[in-house]
Amino acid sequence: MGIQILPPQLANQIAAGEVVERPASVVKELVENSLDAGATRIDIEIDKGGSKLIKIRDNGSGIPKDELALALSRHATSKLHSLDDLEAILSFGFRGEALASISSVSRLTLTSRTAEQTEAWQAYAEGADMAVKVMPAAHPVGSTIEVVDLFFNTPARRRFLKSDKTEFTHIDEWLKRIALVRGDIHFTLTHNGKIVRNCRPAMNEPQYLQRLTQVAGRQFADEALRVECQHDDLRLSGYLQSPWSTVLTDTHYFYVNGRLVRDRLVNHAVRQAFAQKAEVEQPGYVLMLDIDPHQVDVNVHPAKHEVRFHQSRYVHDYILQALQSALEEAGELGFERPFEPSSPQIRDEASLSETGAQTQTEHHAFELQSPESKTHSTWNEASRVDTSRAETSRESRIDSPLGERTRDIASARPYAGVQSNAYGSMAVPRESRSGSAGESRARAELPSKVAIASYGELLQTPSYSVQDKPYQPVLAMPAILNGQYWVLAQGQNLSLLPIQSVALATRSHEVETKLATGLIGQPLLMPVSIAADTDWPALLEEHETLIRQLGLELTIRYQQLIIKKVPPYLRDSQLAKVIPEWLQSLRFEAPAPNALAVWLAEQSLTGFTSAADIWAAYCQLTEEKRQQIADKAVSLPWQSWLEEQASE
């Protein structure tokens, strides 16, 4: 048999094997045509899972009479006219294959009318003969396409269809995905005469959140983090699953210029952004990327499920930085805003924590010692006892699932995960389901009368100086107030020491010590690329020693700054933002070592840090350094407050 050109009918049926996989594929192609026509309302009617009837009705621009027959021909389209158009595709369809392929395996009727026409026209095609009949019809401006008896002339394909319920589930799932990215469109979906889905236009964010709730579920919509980031021609928007949520979800939707695609690059960026921040392996997301159409190729997959970015690494790094920024901002908001429990259960726990803090203030067992004021050695014995108790409590909290959950929820606000009761032991668990249970737990954790009396005697013990005894740091961590301050006692004086300032001071000291010998750079899994300024090559050459000392590996190639290695203190920072800002500062003068240490410390403290770890680092500092930090404590005039209360 010699080589010959296939008949159009056979070629269309072969193409239908790629385009028309199942009824959901037909719905996808026809709805996308309606969207390309500028429709604002699309009604979808399905009968028997789509095997009997698929009917799409829209109010788009319509098709002129003389183009109806041509619309059902293969490789006929109004969306492309030149090779340049193929390199910058913004429409859903562009190959001109869908209608011809669908009509070759079904009985297709296309009715349409444009605004310029006074009457509508209808085109009918059936099966392999592909003969198109055009006749007058009644129809408003827009189009209606009916696909009847799908695969009627290909019995083998029809036998591979699943049950009506399964096929309709695929249709509904695809509609949910397109409804998320096209919130301005009114979609209705009917199955066997019953309205299954009615997505009204979402013209503002509250309305869009309602649509998001319909598609992704209420829990995802209520806990999702908003993403909004723009840089040059790239814009990323959408929603991320909360990193503190442990609920598994199948909401993994990514859109490029409004087109739903599957991309491993995006999945990798999401997993990397959520690394060590989420309980689930694959967090849910609804992300929409707007990019210059010249920078992406959508003509790489028969069903258009995949795309290829011209600068895939740049896009990956951009998405990664945008997601990391959203997660960091969520943590910062949690730190700046006092914790306000939303449920009665958590409110009860918060009140119990406050009660414990008040008890600490009145009968505090810990004291920050200074060279000027030393307490009796009995004090150190009490501290050691409480230290073992606190350590045992922390171990039990970490080992138990309950403790992990409490810590993760509090991680939205740094240091809140280590809130303690009157003696620095475990925070009140979230599983306190009733007021009586909470009260019994509070009574169990409050100090006994004997302990109160003992601590009262200690507070009354006069202080004295021990000049020949070396300074010993307190081993037990002080009580925490509101998740942000340590409550320190010096004699009968109380003061508040900001935990954040201690964290910054201890981390700065650590970094400055290591800077003397140079930081060790850690290679990035995916190097970060940034558009380079013209003077950056000179800056990199001038400050080469300093850059190497910081553990950075920066190169410039094709006018792009490539970040290959960073010190561990910059590992979780927004490199695409932090490094350019630092290079900008080098244009004026090289920073001093202490300024560099503070900068690196600030970048490394953007996430959750345990107050216990901060206190342990504080105790390792020298006496002089500890005293400098302690001087930042704010005194509490609790005695004058008691006098005012007594006078009233």
Swiss-Prot record:
Pfam families registered for this protein in UniProt = DNA_mis_repair, HATPase_c_3, MutL_C
UniProt KW keywords: DNA damage, DNA repair
Which molecular-function annotations from GO does this UniProt entry contain? ATP binding; ATP hydrolysis activity; ATP-dependent DNA damage sensor activity; mismatched DNA binding
What this protein is reported to do is described as: This protein is involved in the repair of mismatches in DNA. It is required for dam-dependent methyl-directed DNA mismatch repair. May act as a 'molecular matchmaker', a protein that promotes the formation of a stable complex between two or more DNA-binding proteins in an ATP-dependent manner without itself being part of a final effector complex.
Tell me which NCBIfam families the record gives. mutl, PRK00095.1-1
Origin organism of this chain?
Shewanella sp. (strain ANA-3)
Instruction: Name the chain's protein.
Output: DNA mismatch repair protein MutL
Q: List the disulfide bonds.
A: none
Biological process per Gene Ontology, one example term: mismatch repair
Locate the region Disordered.
336-443
